[in-house]
Amino acid sequence: MNHKKIIITIFVVTLILVCVCIFAYPSLYEYQCKNRYFENFSKKITNEILESNIVVVKQEKKIAEDITTFSWDFGASGVVFDSEDNTYYALTAYHVVKDFENADYIIIPYGVPTYSEYSKNSKTHISNQMYYEQFEKAQLVFADETYDLAVISFKSEKKLKVLPICEDNPKYNEAIMVISNPEGERFFHSYGNICSKDYYIFESNDELPPVSTFKHNAYENYGSSGSVVLNKKMEIVGINIGGGRDFMNRFKYGVMVPCELISEFLEKCNQNNT
């Protein structure tokens, strides 16, 4: 009888441990990645740095029986890396803007209230269309699906800071920061480390070719595509294009196109536009 009780006890304990590993640990890991905080980074986050980041919102127009309707997604991310007068050039992911021929992409800058905030504080009703009409539309400059990267341009009367691109890929375990727009949350900061010692071949669900990337553990989610990955010098070391999630949709890792490949992509962009 005692032997049987021992076996049952071992089985129950094992089952509990398995359940903890499957259900509890991934949730704790996601929480840690989302709430991790690097004080030395946070001191360098100025309004200028934040203003270099943008929300890229897809606007689709549909006409049915002479009735025109518009729809907007939650938005993705992008970062300014170059400028000419009041024209600014931003990096984002190719899959964010791949429908450029059939849709418009609206640029929402840092510091602007969301539609819900705008509506709540307005004395008169404002439609979605009225809200989005106040923002600039992006122009596609260059895109390459083999990198899952794109360059877009937009106008801004406000002077924006141009963030430099780092020359060398980040090292394994190097500290990083991501500024992105996960699930509609605007300009969210997440912190982490580079998890790759070499290139990781990432295959997305967007029917794009495999892309050479680096893994990291700074939190990201849907809407983070195209977002910037910064080092301690506030240099661009990567652009996020996706990541891994478990069967319960919990964060496992992010993937970014590292800066050496970004520079390679921009060389092609310059050649294409000369």
Predicted feature residues:
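Extracytoplasmic
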Residues: 49-53, 71-76, 85-87, 91, ...
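Serine endopeptidase catalytic core focused on the charge-relay Asp
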Residues: 130-201, 231-232, 241, 253
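Active-site region of chymotrypsin-like
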Residues: 51-71, 155-161, 188-273
